[in-house]
């Protein structure tokens, strides 16, 4: 019995048969529904998405940067355990790392769909242009994926060995696990360093390098993408952890949830500052290159999405609710079912706001193009 209890520490409880069947049916339905639209894309090209010379990017790119940011943010959260060794985040570390790999694959699928000729994407891997920011970003993405996959495999191997040795650990098993733990920590450090030039920081750097879009150009864009990634990942991980625990009929770890909520609250404050510094300088400068795009967001056709969707639902309400739950609500209420639902609604609002922020950053800048003279 004691051995079985120790094994459960390392291996999560399996899903029920009913939950597995329901999940398989949902995935099958989504795959069948998406197959038609994928065929339409391959058969009819980008015309089915309404792409033009003036609006070359659209919702696919928005979804791409959402998932790439989610991948980078989840990896950073997993590094709280695998690099910094903060024990309270241990219950969600492996989930964060696994979801990071999945999100990165999904982001690459969406950017592949956005390419005019998907078959030409192989050329970006085979040929390298030293002066191309896109070429550097693709290489950083591939390196980041190799690191993340290798680390995830080692984590699974380490957890399996820990479960097998839970009853009678030997010195040899402890030595092997120690070596694997060191390798995991080294890979985590490499992955965190790569995140500044890969997902999520590299995506922001790529946008900031586009001189023809005044809203994107500038150093704050890269910081904005980085903070957006942490905010989105924290909210997503809280929702996913609660949902999976409910499907397993288990109780989520309260300490891990409190830690994630604190990360979310702090990163929301940082995101608010980043959004302010992204839009305030262009408005104050009056430069048409960027002020026009910001005007579209704050007072033009995209204003309802900005003020109601992003500011109110995505920033103000979640920040106020998370701050109240963490620092001002009674301890008993913080652990109640009502508080859990309030936190769930707050996290859902953050996810909506994070998607809208990426949508606004991409779409508001597209109608405004700067003519860059040839040098």
Predicted regions, residues:
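Long, contiguous internal "core" modules enriched in hydrophobic/ aromatic residues
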Residues: 10-14, 20, 24-36, 88, ...
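Structured alpha-helical bundle/scaffold domains in large eukaryotic membrane-trafficking regulators
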Residues: 3, 117, 161, 285-288, ...
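Transmembrane-helix bundle segments that line or gate the permeation/cavity pathway
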Residues: 36-49, 53-54, 66-127, 133-167, ...
């Amino acid at each position: 019995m004691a051995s079985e209890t120790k094994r459960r520490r390392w291996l999560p409880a399996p899903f029920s048969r009913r939950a597995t069947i329901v999940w398989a049916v949902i995935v099958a339905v989504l795959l069948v529904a998406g197959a038609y639209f994928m065929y339409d894309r391959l058969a009819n090209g980008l015309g089915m998405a309404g792409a033009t010379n003036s609006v070359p990017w659209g919702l696919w790119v928005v979804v791409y940067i959402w998932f790439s940011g989610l991948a980078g943010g989840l990896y950073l959260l997993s590094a709280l355990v695998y690099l910094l060794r903060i024990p309270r985040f241990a219950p969600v570390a492996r989930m964060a790392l696994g979801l990071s790999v999945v999100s990165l694959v999904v982001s690459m699928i969406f950017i592949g769909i956005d390419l005019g000729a998907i078959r030409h994407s192989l050329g970006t891997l085979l040929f390298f242009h030293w002066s191309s920011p896109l070429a550097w970003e693709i290489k950083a993405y591939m390196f980041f994926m190799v690191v993340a996959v290798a680390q995830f495999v080692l984590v699974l191997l380490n957890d399996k060995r820990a479960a097998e040795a839970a009853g009678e650990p030997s010195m040899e098993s402890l030595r092997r696990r120690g070596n694997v733990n060191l390798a995991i920590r080294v890979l985590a450090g490499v992955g965190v360093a790569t995140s500044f030039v890969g997902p999520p920081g590299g995506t922001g750097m790529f946008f900031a390098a586009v001189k023809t879009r005044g809203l994107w150009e500038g150093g704050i864009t890269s910081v904005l993408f980085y903070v957006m990634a942490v905010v989105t990942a924290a909210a997503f991980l809280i929702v996913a952890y609660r949902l999976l625990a409910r499907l397993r009929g288990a109780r989520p770890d309260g300490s891990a949830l409190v830690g994630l909520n604190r990360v979310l609250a702090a990163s929301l404050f940082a995101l608010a500052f980043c959004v302010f510094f992204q839009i305030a300088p262009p408005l104050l400068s009056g430069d048409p290159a960027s002020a026009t795009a910001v005007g579209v967001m704050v007072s033009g056709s995209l204003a309802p999405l900005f003020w109601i969707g992003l500011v109110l639902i995505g920033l103000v309400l979640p920040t106020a609710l998370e701050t109240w739950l963490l620092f001002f609500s009674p301890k008993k209420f913080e652990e109640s079912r009502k508080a859990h639902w309030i936190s769930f609604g707050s996290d859902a609002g953050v996810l909506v706001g994070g998607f809208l922020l990426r949508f606004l950053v991409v779409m508001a800048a597209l109608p405004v193009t700067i003519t860059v003279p040839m040098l």
